[in-house]
Amino acid sequence: MIYFVGAGSGAPDLITVRGARLLSEADVIVYAGSLVNPALLDYKKDGCEVYNSAKMTLEEVIAVMAPAAKAGKTVVRLHTGDPCVYGAHREQMDELDRLGLAYEVCPGVSSFCGAAAALKAEYTLPNVSQSVILTRMEGRTPVPEKEQIESFAAHGATMVIFLSAGQLARLSERLIAGGYAPDTPAAIVDKATWPDEKVVRTTVADLAEAGAREGITKTALITVGGFLGTEYERSKLYDPTFTTEFREASR
């Protein structure tokens, strides 16, 4: 059996209990060495084969996993964060489907959740934003025309922008062109939940300056929106005047 396992956002103790168990049972581990914390390999058992996929192609990854699975071995494909967000695991699953090999997915803590924890922030504040947009700037991987930064910025919702720390000046321009005010709160979270995590609070207009000042060029998330401000409405969930399935309004 092959298991796609989310490694979590960085700190090794943020992997799920299931993920840690699967790592400890694996006969073969193929991990994304460019981003996964190597401390997670401490979970492996003696004799486990370990492959760093940082320099491997899709075909080479499959060439490791498929024969092992066919031989009855337990294989873990360890991805950073949660595999469903920029994890490139769909193409691997399609290849396994083609080969008739079984697999399961074990979710992980995405870096956008780790960033919120680092910021001590809530993305969905009442009367501020009830939506979170996860997106990226185009690079070597293009972005569909209908998913341009300006289009998303027009909503004024909370935005979390991946894989774009090297384009902060252009990102700032496009966010403002889309509708965010230049003084909209923003933050850069570098290596969320890692020991050397760095949080830089700034504004949309000053993203590039803040990134340059701190020497941030990659492995960072950019968060944008009023959720980083100080004003919001109290949640109805714990309001004494609000009746729920479990509690009658007290006044």
Model segments located where?
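Class I S-adenosyl-L-methionine
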Residues: 1-109, 208, 220
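A contiguous loop/helix-start segment that scaffolds small-molecule binding in enzyme catalytic cores
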Residues: 2, 60, 71-75, 131, ...
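Flexible, active-site-adjacent loop/turn segments at secondary-structure boundaries
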Residues: 12-13, 38, 83-84, 107, ...
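Short secondary-structure boundary/capping segments
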Residues: 20, 42, 67, 124-125, ...
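Short secondary-structure transition/capping segments
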Residues: 43-44, 63-64, 116-120, 136-137, ...
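Class I SAM-dependent methyltransferase SAM-binding "motif I" and its flanking Rossmann-like core
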Residues: 82-155, 198-201
